[in-house]
Amino acid sequence: GAVVNAGNDKGAPGQALADLALLAARHGDWESLRISWLGGAQCGLACDLITAAIYAPFELFMALPEWGEPDHSLLDMALRAGAKIFLSRDPELVLENAHAVYMGHGPEQCAAAPLTSGWPLTDELLALAAEDAAVLSWHGLAPADRASDTALRRAAAFWPERLAARRLMEARLYAL
């Protein structure tokens, strides 16, 4: 049978594929789909989204603290391949008109990070995204100090649909 990486500390390509399929179906158009990432992006789902941006024409906007930048060789490869990836230290710029907002990991998951680094997903930041923007997080729900109650409620509301999409994607991949 096929070997499928359904997710671990290094990545979650199955989740990335499922999320992208769900978000594209929800939005209806790859070309204008804007995905935002807020927080650390050294590994995991963030790197899978960077890789996916090589093959799918969505826009990936990432607000990254200094300690949370993705692998530079992966980023360089993606940009050379034509991926539409935009990096910033300004979360307001990154979240503006986003159709999906990922809450990346915080400094507690990065040994080199100062404890004060990173941005929580506040109501003020979330208000910059599209009104119906999906809120997603790296491992289930983010700790309450990383997101407002509104953001956590939106992430929780989207979680069942996201989990179902992942199970469907994994079933399709296992059937190969």
Model-inferred region functions:
Residues 1-24, 142-144:
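Phosphate/diphosphate ligand-binding glycine-rich loop within oxidoreductases
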Residues 7-11, 65-67, 161-165:
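Short, acidic/turn-prone active-site loops that include or flank metal/cofactor-
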Residues 10-13, 43, 67-69, 109, ...:
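Short, small-residue-enriched loops and turns at beta-alpha junctions
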Residues 12-18, 71-73, 167-172:
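Short, charged, surface-exposed secondary-structure boundary motifs
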Residues 18-23, 99-106, 172-176:
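Short, surface-exposed amphipathic charged segments that create phosphate/polyanion-binding patches used
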Residues 25-103:
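Glycine-rich phosphate/diphosphate-binding loop of Rossmann-like nucleotide-binding domains
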Residues 79-167:
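Rossmann-like adenosine-cofactor binding region
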